[in-house]
Amino acid sequence: MWALCSLLRSAAGRTMSQGRTISQAPARRERPRKDPLRHLRTREKRGPSGCSGGPNTVYLQVVAAGSRDSGAALYVFSEFNRYLFNCGEGVQRLMQEHKLKVARLDNIFLTRMHWSNVGGLSGMILTLKETGLPKCVLSGPPQLEKYLEAIKIFSGPLKGIELAVRPHSAPEYEDETMTVYQIPIHSEQRRGKHQPWQSPERPLSRLSPERSSDSESNENEPHLPHGVSQRRGVRDSSLVVAFICKLHLKRGNFLVLKAKEMGLPVGTAAIAPIIAAVKDGKSITHEGREILAEELCTPPDPGAAFVVVECPDESFIQPICENATFQRYQGKADAPVALVVHMAPASVLVDSRYQQWMERFGPDTQHLVLNENCASVHNLRSHKIQTQLNLIHPDIFPLLTSFRCKKEGPTLSVPMVQGECLLKYQLRPRREWQRDAIITCNPEEFIVEALQLPNFQQSVQEYRRSAQDGPAPAEKRSQYPEIIFLGTGSAIPMKIRNVSATLVNISPDTSLLLDCGEGTFGQLCRHYGDQVDRVLGTLAAVFVSHLHADHHTGLPSILLQRERALASLGKPLHPLLVVAPNQLKAWLQQYHNQCQEVLHHISMIPAKCLQEGAEISSPAVERLISSLLRTCDLEEFQTCLVRHCKHAFGCALVHTSGWKVVYSGDTMPCEALVRMGKDATLLIHEATLEDGLEEEAVEKTHSTTSQAISVGMRMNAEFIMLNHFSQRYAKVPLFSPNFSEKVGVAFDHMKVCFGDFPTMPKLIPPLKALFAGDIEEMEERREKRELRQVRAALLSRELAGGLEDGEPQQKRAHTEEPQAKKVRAQ
C-alpha cells in the first residue's frame, strides 16, 4: 500500500516537472458557485425586515482598540445581522482568531477614507466573496466607491458578490436590527467649500468606466484594467462620517405561565391571535374579563441608540459640537443614547469643547474610547507560539513586545472606558459592560503548557547539547545581513502566520522589505516595540513581487508610518525606493486620487527593468537604480519573471561583500529563478503545499516543499529557507525526507543570520515535539488522502485491465460488466 502511495507521489512529481516549461502560469479553473449561506436561508424564511420585531440580543464588541499596530474597529452583533465599523489592516486576522464570523458580515461602515480605516478592506471583500456572501452594503465617504473600483486592479472582476455603496448623502439605512443615519462632518478648514463628488447607492458591477483627459500613459503610468475609472477623483481628507444607530423596538415577551394561570388556551391554535394582540399592546377579553397587555407581556424595549464618531484632530471639534443632528440626541429622554464610541486621540479628548460635548449626552450615556493609549494585546496566539518557540532558541525566536504610547490618557467627567480587544457593551437584553472575553496574555501559562508536552524538554536539552558538542565554525560570520520573517503564511492573514513580508537588515542603518502584505507594519510593531520608528528610519527600499493582496496591501501603511517615524526622529522625508510591477503604481494612483496623498512617498523602479539584459526605460529610472545599489551597498539587484500570475517576479540581491540572497516570491519551480540564483548564499523559497499535492500546486501556481528544496539544490544554494506556507499548516508544515542540513522552516518573527545556518536543521526535533499534536493531525489527513488516491488508482486499473484492446467501447462495457461487478463485490 505505502509503496503504491510513494509511486503515486513520484508520478505526480514527474508529471509536474515534465509539464509546462514556459514561465507563463496555467489558467486557474473557475470555482463552482457556493450554495447560499445558512443564515441567508434563515433570513428568507423569517420574512421581511421588522415583521417580527427587533432582535433579542445586541452588543458591540471591540475588534481593534486603536493601538498603533491595530487601528480601531468595532463589531456589532445581533441574531439577525452583523456589522463592522472600520476595517483597517489586521482586522480580518483578529476576527478569524477570535471567532467573529466574517461570513456573516452584511454591512461595513467607514468613518473616513484613511488607510487606518480601510487598509484591510480589500482583503476582507475578497474573503467575503470566497465565503459566498451575495451582497455587502458599504457606507461612508463618497470616495469609497472609487476605492472599491481600484481593488479590481489586482483582484480582477469581483464576480459573485454585490457591493452596494451608500455615500453619506444617501437616505438612512434600515434592516432587521436597526436604522443607521450617516452624519457628514467637515473640518473647519473645509467648511464653505464645494461639496465633493457624490453618487447614489448602486452595485459596483454596474459601474461604467469613465474616460480620462490624461489617457496617454508611459511605462510608469500603466493603463487601468477595464471597469476601473481613470478619472481624477476628489480627495477630501476634511470629511469624516459619524453614524447614529437606533435599534428597532422589541416587543415584550409573552408570559406563558401567567397565561396558564389566567386560563388562556395555551398550547392550542387559539392562543396565536391572543399573543399577537398583547405583543402589539392591545387588551383582550377572555371569558368576559378584560386582560391588559401588560399583564401578559413584559414591557417592550423601545430601542436605545448608539453613536460612532471619529474626531481625527482638533479641527473637527467645533463642527462636531455644533452639529444639529447630534444635539437632537443629547440629553433627550425620548431619544436615549446608551453609548458613544469615540475614535479620537488624547489631544482631542482633553479639549474642553469636546469634553463639554460629551457631557451633554447626560449621565446615563456610556463612552468608549479607541485610540493609541490602548495597551491591549490583540494577537494572543502569535504571542503564545512565540513564547514557546523562544524556549528552543531565544535569539532566533525573540519574544514579542508591543508599541506603547508614552502619553497618559485624559481624566474625564463622564463614564468613560478605554477600549480593549474583545471588550463588549451589551445593549440587549440589558445594558452592561462585559469583560469576560477580554484577552489576557500570560506568558507563564504558555511556558508551563509547552514544558508539559511529551518529549519537548528532552528534545530541547538534546539540541542544546548537540550545539555545544558540535564542531566550532571555521569562521565567525557577521551579524548582517539579518533576516526577519514578518509574515510566512499565504493567501489571507491568520492567527499564527501573517501574510508575506520579510525584512532584510543589510546593516545597522539600512534595510529593505521583500514583499509587504497586509499587517506588515503591525508585525514590525510587535517585533520591535518602541524601536519601530528607528527601524522604519532605516528602510531604504521595498520589493513587491506581484499584485496579490497578500503581498502588497501593507505598503500604504508602511509609507504613512515611515513619514511619521522620520518626523519623530528629526529626519527629512525622502521617497522610498519601490521595486514592483508597473501595475502597483496604478493602484497607488487610485488611492492617492481618492483618499490620501501617497505618491510623493515613493520612487518607483519597474521590476522588469532589473531583469538580465533589460533596457532601462528612462534616465530617471537609471538614476533610481544607481541610488538603490548605492544606498543598499549592493553590487546587483536583479529580477526575473517567475511562474505564478502575470507580472510576477523573483529577485536576487548581491552585496558588495559577496553574499547573495534570492527571494522567489510566489512561483512554481522556475528555471529562470534557478539561473538567476546560481550559488546563492540564501534562498528564500515559497513552499505553499506539502508533498503529494503537486496537482493542486500546479492549479494554484505554487510549489510543494520538495519542489522548493529541489530548486535550491539545483541552484547550489548554501542554505534554503522555506516560506509562504498554506494556512492549513498554521503552526508547522509537514517535514519531508528531503529536509537536510541545508533546509530550514520560516516562522513569523524568526530572526536568522548566516551564522545560524548550521543551527537551523537541529531545531527540527524540538519543533516536532512542540507541534506533535498538529503534525499527527496533518499526517492523518495525508494518509486518508493517499488512501483515497490508492482506491481510485486500483479501481481504475481493475476497470482498464478487464478491457481488451481494439474492441468497441459499448461492446467492451457489455461483455465485461459481470466481471467488473464481481471484482467490486470482492
From Swiss-Prot:
Annotated GO MF terms: 3'-tRNA processing endoribonuclease activity; metal ion binding; RNA binding; RNA endonuclease activity; tRNA-specific ribonuclease activity
Enzyme superclass (EC): hydrolase
Tissue note: Widely expressed. Highly expressed in heart, placenta, liver, skeletal muscle, kidney, pancreas, testis and ovary. Weakly expressed in brain, lung, spleen, thymus, prostate, small intestine, colon and leukocytes.
Pfam family, one: Lactamase_B_2
Impact reported for residue 217 to L: In HPC2; risk factor for disease development; does not affect the enzymatic activity
Residue interval of the organelle targeting sequence: 1-16
Subunit structure: Homodimer. Interacts with PTCD1.
PANTHER family reported for this sequence: ZINC PHOSPHODIESTERASE ELAC PROTEIN 2
Protein name, as recorded: Zinc phosphodiesterase ELAC protein 2
Species in which this protein is naturally found: Homo sapiens
